[in-house]
Design a protein with these regions (language model features):
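Short, extreme N-terminal segment that most often corresponds to the first beta-strand
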Residues: 1-30
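A general secondary-structure signal for short beta-strands and their flanking turns/coil
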Residues: 2-4, 64-68, 92
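Ordered hydrophobic segments in well-structured contexts
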Residues: 4-10, 52-54, 68-72, 98-100, ...
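Short, flexible beta-strand-to-coil junctions
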Residues: 12, 74-76, 104-106
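Structural alpha-beta junctions
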Residues: 26-32, 92-101
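Short, intrinsically disordered low-complexity segments
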Residues: 31-81
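Short, hydrophobic/π-rich interface segment
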Residues: 78-99
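Acidic, proline/glycine-rich low-complexity IDRs
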Residues: 89, 97-151
Length: 151
């Protein structure tokens, strides 16, 4: 099941775990989501200009309560910056990632080197002003721990 939204996620009570997982993912990705009601945290994150979210809910895991969730965050920005490194930095700034010590190229994927060691990966589309923030393995582990905690 897919959810696509600009500002909010349409959900009912049985999808609360998805909302919690998305909020946790945003907290991991942006490091700027304040603790509060889950819906408020998600709404705050989605109110960022140009932020769009695709959430895929996979089939339930046999014997477990939670759903595996795949999250893709895509940000469109209108900076008009042509330099790829500047473009990645602009995407990162718009995502609330302010402290970047370096940008490393890995093909179409750019690693944003963070001073705290929690590097971020951005998938860059060189033909447009678009970038996708990818969850790293560490991000996914933190998200998994959160999902187990709320289950």
């Amino acid at each position: 099941m897919y959810y696509w939204t600009d500002l909010h996620l349409e959900h009912d009570d049985k999808d609360d775990r998805i909302v919690e997982a998305v909020a946790a993912a945003f907290e991991i990705a942006t490091e700027s989501v304040t603790v509060g009601r889950i819906d408020d945290a998600v709404q705050d994150a989605w109110n960022a200009p140009g932020l769009q979210v695709l959430v895929q809910r996979d089939d339930p895991v046999p014997g477990r309560l939670e759903f595996p969730v795949t999250l893709m965050v895509t940000l469109r920005h209108g900076t008009g910056v042509g330099d790829p490194v500047s473009k990645v930095r602009a995407i990162a700034r718009n995502l609330g990632i302010g402290l970047i010590t370096d940008v490393e190229t890995q093909g179409d994927t750019w690693r944003l080197v963070m001073p705290d060691g929690k590097d971020k990966l951005v998938q860059l589309d060189p033909s447009s002003d678009q970038g996708t923030l990818l969850l790293t393995r560490q991000d996914r582990q933190e998200l998994d721990r959160h999902r187990v905690a709320v289950a």
